[in-house]
Amino acid sequence: MDPSAAVEKAMEMAEQGAQIIDLGGESTRPGSDFISEEEEIRRVLPVLEKLPTDQFIISIDTTKTKVAQLALEAGAHLINDVSGGSTELLKAAHTYNAGFILMHSQGKPKSMQEQPSYMNTVTEIGEFFDQKKEQIKELGLPRLWVDPGIGFGKTLTHNLEIMRNIHTFLDETWGVLLGSSRKSWIDHLCDAPDPVKRLGGSIASAIDAVAKGVEIIRVHDVSETVQAIQVAKELATDPENK
């Protein structure tokens, strides 16, 4: 995407209610190919340098330490690490006093959906996060979120188990992030092969997650999701206790 077009899209999303803009130069969806560090920097930095870093929070979505360091120097506020808590990325977050998003995944993007397998999906993901807890506490990061990684080495059954039980990942050490928007689990459940036609499923999962205590919802359709969550929260509120 042209840097100017990417900046325009980011500004549009912020105006619609997005509080965090997640910026990434490399696709990590299942089946995607690896790109070089140099290419990722070439894609990301021109966009980041044009974004107003004082108007919203910017998250750099990367698995590469050098990319994260340059992005944080250019004004990004968070590292979104889909690799599962790289020690070097955690150290970079500590060095730059940045927030961190720790995502669970099973396998590499190219092959993660070939044969994902768990004995107990929710328990194993929870144990994965717990194993990182002491290291994270020692670093003293300003903010931390965990992301169970919907679609990253998971079948439809795994994804549904995670979303039904996402409240079990809540912890005083971190908040929880859910990225379920437009993903293939909606197609597998509702026969919606076109990602753009998955708005209903995306919003339903967002409303459910917020009701269960999830702090961050990663979405594509900002205005629709913001409106839906606002209405759902209002309907769930006892007017006598407002």
Regions found by a protein language model. Give the residues of each.
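Active-site-adjacent loop and "lid" segments of alpha/beta metabolic enzymes
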Residues: 1-9, 28-50, 54-57, 65-66, ...
